[in-house]
């Protein structure tokens, strides 16, 4: 059976708030192992206004932040980390294969 989290439960785990809370739901996770999360991306996201007008794509740095927040949920949902903050220290040789766009 899948473990899922709604936005309120995610907000109990992560310190991020709008507009920088970049995951909307967790479909499944195993504490300390993995997390499958989603961000509902719509055409009116604030970052689309300048990135890029007429051809909006999610900025790569926000894609990395979405991944970091997803990983943080996998770590911070463990009882021993309740109330802690996870920090993503760095990333090397990141490649983006396809752009993320609004539907």
Residue ranges and their predicted role:
Residues 4, 16-20, 61:
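Electropositive phosphate-/nucleotide-binding environments in soluble metabolic enzymes
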Residues 14, 30, 45, 71-75:
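Short amphipathic alpha-helical segments enriched in hydrophobics
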Residues 11, 54, 96-99:
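Beta-strand-rich interaction surfaces with strong enrichment in secreted/lumenal proteins
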Residues 4-10:
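Short Pro/Gly-enriched beta-strand edge/turn motifs at strand-loop
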Residues 50-59, 63-73, 88:
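Compact, glycine-rich, soluble single-domain proteins
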Residues 2-4, 70-103:
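Hydrophobic beta-strand-centered segment that forms part of the acyl-chain substrate-binding groove
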Residues 18-58:
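Catalytic strand-loop segment that frames the active site of acyl-thioester-processing enzymes
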């Amino acid at each position: 059976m899948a473990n899922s989290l709604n936005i309120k439960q995610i907000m109990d785990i992560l310190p991020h708030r709008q507009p920088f809370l970049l995951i909307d739901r967790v479909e499944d996770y195993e504490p300390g192992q993995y997390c499958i999360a989603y961000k509902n991306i719509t055409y009116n996201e604030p970052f689309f206004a300048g990135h890029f007008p007429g051809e909006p794509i999610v900025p790569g740095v926000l894609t990395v932040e979405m991944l970091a927040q997803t990983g943080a949920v996998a770590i911070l949902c463990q009882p021993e980390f309740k109330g802690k903050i996870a920090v993503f220290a760095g990333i090397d040789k990141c490649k983006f294969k396809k752009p993320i766009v609004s539907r």
